[in-house]
Amino acid sequence: MIESIQELLQKEAQAVLNIPVTDAYEKAVELIVEQIHRKKGKLVTSGMGKAGQIAMNIATTFCSTGIPSVFLHPSEAQHGDLGILQEND
């Protein structure tokens, strides 16, 4: 069992190492730093279906690391949930 857990962790670590650091990636990181840390906004993720599940996971992961984040479901946004957004988000 320990071996399978170690193998899983090694695969996950390799997957993180394989993330390409492109200009788009760097711009996304800069935007997050600017809006959240300098302007005191929060990260807002959104999506439906599988993309929504991933967006929700991203928001909860950022929250657990102390970065203000919220998931906004697109259909709920049209019915009043846009109120969660503030100026620096």
Located regions from the model:
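Conserved N-terminal alpha-helical segment that immediately precedes and caps sugar-phosphate-binding
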Residues: 1-89
